[in-house]
Amino acid sequence: MYTSVLLNVESTILDFWRLLKPRIMYLVVFTAVAGMVTAPGSMHPFLALISLICVALGSGSAGAINMWYDRDIDLLMERTKNRPIPSGRVSAESALEFGITLGILSVFIMAIAVNYISAALLAVSILFYVFIYTIWLKRRTPQNIVIGGAAGAFPPMIGWAAVTNSVSWESFILFLVIFMWTPPHFWALSLNKSEDYAKASIPMSNIVYGPEKTRKYILIYSVLLVLTSLLPALFLKKALLYLSMATFEGCVFIWYAVSVMKFKNHSSQKKMFSYSISYLFSLFASIIFCSIDLF
């Protein structure tokens, strides 16, 4: 009996954890770290930790509210039908309350403990993801990912603002890198999940314009991404080293995009999607490494 109760509690905790979309949250926090490290000045380690926790909670808040709103279409898609809400393991009301609570807490703590600018940016990123992307764009236009991608591009700006109490062109460049990365990343996924998106009536690019045009868009955005990814060299301490690292990582990205156009199959699209995640981690790791003095 006692073991059964413990298992139920553990299962519930895991389901609420899944509402936060942890894989996205890890990436969000990592890019926020890049913003903090590249920013001029310094920050007390404890406040830096508080800032990152707030970013994580804010990201999780947006994820939970997104799952609450999308519970109807999640039920229709193979990829999402086993999520906590459509599977019935977490009630829609509980998920919404959980998401709103986390969002309010994250912004409030950021404002009180860190500064108002970083808190405002965090609030904008949450609201943009929920209202602009989830509620307005996702079900209405194939530009959903293009415009909606801005929501996930805020973390480096938030990290920068946490340190400097300001927004600058440098942090906006980091924003642009993620903004340009988002479309090819999600289009590679959507090409392999066309039936799911069609069943849920989500107007992804490949559903509206067809797979051929979408593959061309992937290549175009990949080239634009790689060009944008070179811009941080303008303010990083090890500019030449960063340029070489970003160029290599970017060439591999374009190679995968070309493979998607050339082979037009599930395998090439899956590899493109997988590499795009590794690419963003690697690129921002390069940004972090090239902004600190180790030798």
UniProtKB/Swiss-Prot annotation:
* One Gene Ontology biological process: heme O biosynthetic process
- Transmembrane domains' residue ranges: 24-44, 45-65, 94-114, 117-137, 144-164, 171-191, 216-236, 240-260, 272-292
Cite the entry's keywords alphabetically.
Cell membrane, Heme biosynthesis, Membrane, Transferase, Transmembrane, Transmembrane helix
Share any extra remarks. Answer: Carbon 2 of the heme B porphyrin ring is defined according to the Fischer nomenclature.
**Keyword tRNA processing part of the UniProt annotation:** no
Enzyme category, top tier: transferase
State what protein this is by name: Protoheme IX farnesyltransferase
The pathway entry for this protein reads as: Porphyrin-containing compound metabolism; heme O biosynthesis; heme O from protoheme: step 1/1
EC number annotated for this UniProt entry:
2.5.1.141
Where, subcellularly, is it found?
A: Cell membrane
Its UniProt entry gives the catalysed reaction(s) as:
heme b + (2E,6E)-farnesyl diphosphate + H2O = Fe(II)-heme o + diphosphate
Which InterPro entries does the record associate with it? Protohaem_IX_farnesylTrfase (IPR006369), UbiA_prenyltransferase (IPR000537), UbiA_prenylTrfase_CS (IPR030470), UbiA_sf (IPR044878)
Q: Which family does it belong to?
A: Belongs to the UbiA prenyltransferase family. Protoheme IX farnesyltransferase subfamily.
Tell me where on the tree of life, at the top rank, the source sits: Bacteria
> What is the membrane topology here?
Multi-pass membrane protein
* GO terms, molecular function: protoheme IX farnesyltransferase activity
Show the GO cellular component annotation of the record: plasma membrane
Which purpose does this protein serve, as stated in its record? Answer: Converts heme B (protoheme IX) to heme O by substitution of the vinyl group on carbon 2 of heme B porphyrin ring with a hydroxyethyl farnesyl side group.
